Amino acid sequence: MVNALPEVKRAVAEAQPAGADAAQLKSGTLGEGANMPIKVGQVEALFRYPVKSMGGERLEMAELGWHGLDGDRRLALRRLDNRGGFPWLTAGKLPELIRFTPRRKGEAAGSSLPTHVRTPEGEELPVFSQELAADLGRRSGSPVEMMHLNRGIFDEASISVITSATVDEIGRLAAERPDVRRFRPNILLSSLRSLPFEEDDWVGGALWFGDTDDAAAIGVTNRDERCSMVNLDPDSARPSAEVLKSIVRVRDNRAGVYGTVTRRGRLAVGQAVFFEPAAER
């Protein structure tokens, strides 16, 4: 990607010219057609999932590297008796897995990788222990082992984004309390336009996080095709089929977008987010 930060900075400087229409500022349309990135919103929340399919962490700040957020999905449970192309134990096979919570203890408190996992019953077991593997093997019905992969274990892409407007709309359609945790994104955006499924319009373009010279960026590659995990209540693991049905019904089973990292940097809650259409890059 061509470094678009000069354009981003100009967009920020010119975003509020004298006499600018307030509706344009609110909608984010100011600057369209002016060959510059457009401010689309800000980072509302950041999430990291140290162990694939287990509970996530809500962060105020995170480092974005070539393989996603630092520490995201670097650990996963491998099913030892599986010879297929996808050997990982996920909440699709064991819904209760989302109620397991990775934790850090002692000197590892500042590390991106967990040292322990808290079970739904409150027991804390070392992340690479035989005790944890035996517990999860018993629950899933097949032996498992914890694996550490430096580049992460992703189903589709290393970074995922969804807007709060999309989460709220799906909750309304499914008659369920909106809960972003069902969608397991890395980045939750609060968009200026507050339009559900606005993310679809970003495919093929780029998102920039902040307006500094070291701003991080991702290329938006495709819409996020959803699976039954969105049906699981993050606290109880109880399913509600209406969530996935609603996404299938109104959006061809897609909600949110995937991306690939094109510029490393730091992400932070409250950070301004700019969209750069493909034609302008």
Give, region by region, the residue ranges found by the protein language model:
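N-terminal amphipathic/basic-hydrophobic helices that include classical n-h-c signal peptides
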Residues: M1-N35
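Metal-cofactor-dependent catalytic cores
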Residues: L25-R281
